[in-house]
Amino acid sequence: MIVKTRAVVLREIKYRDQSKICTLFTSEFGKLTAILKGGRNPKSRLSGKFSAGNVLDIVLYKKNGRDIQLISDGSLLFSPLSAEPDMERFATMYRIIDLISQALEGEEKNLPLFSLLTGVLEILYSTEERFELLFIWFLLRMISTLGFEPSLDRCVYSGEPLSAAAETMMLRELSFVMNPGGVALPAAALRQISQQHSITMPAYRLLSELSSTPLSALDEVDAGKAETEFLCKLLQEYCRLHLDHTPRNRNLAVVAQMLSK
């Protein structure tokens, strides 16, 4: 059966002399594996189009029950190479597609997650800075879409409004609880044994603001470097815990190598 769908390339590996096998996240069929015959041949009209992070409209020969589908055609929509080369942009891209790959279970359609991914990648490939802030914004929406959104407005234990309580008690920090996910007042968190991290009030306010800021207004957010870096690490850890397995070493090694240069 010949089908058309939009797709994001999550991974590509060499196959034989000139072909490649791609892991794709598609709008219509979820995550699937497909072969691009002759895709590494420089003379092929599809050469270079099916690279990690690229977003395309594709044509597949799809057969139910077959493990590997066949790519027939593809039209590139946007790519990390469409902007000036930037190692931080590539590092952010690999973080995003790695987490998406972990979150997907086979050929299960997930249009909200697909729309989130393509929307964020389009912005990522067209912006020149604040990649980490965009990554935090993405993480918050991804965990919400997947159903493990942390409680940010009220204490995850007592239910008290966090901002009002923090102001009344003149708190300098709160606690971010990994499971159940959410932010807690220090007094309530002390009585629990769950894994948790201290979060400063500036970091909490940034987290809360990003949770309600639309993507179109992200440039208006005032974010400190320390708070941004902290939230990146915190939310990645939170995602890994709730996705119930660790990131693929291959993509994380690529990220580490990029950021060290």
UniProtKB/Swiss-Prot annotation:
GO process terms (BP): DNA recombination; double-strand break repair
Entry GO terms, CC: bacterial nucleoid
InterPro entries (alphabetical): ARFGAP/RecO, DNA_rep/recomb_RecO_N, NA-bd_OB-fold, RecO, RecO_C
Pfam families from the UniProt entry: RecO_C, RecO_N
Alphabetic keyword roster: DNA damage, DNA recombination, DNA repair
Taxonomic superkingdom: Bacteria
Family membership: Belongs to the RecO family.
Main function: Involved in DNA repair and RecF pathway recombination.
Protein name: DNA repair protein RecO
Provenance organism: Chlorobium limicola (strain DSM 245 / NBRC 103803 / 6330)
Lineage start: Bacteria, Pseudomonadati, Chlorobiota, Chlorobiia, Chlorobiales
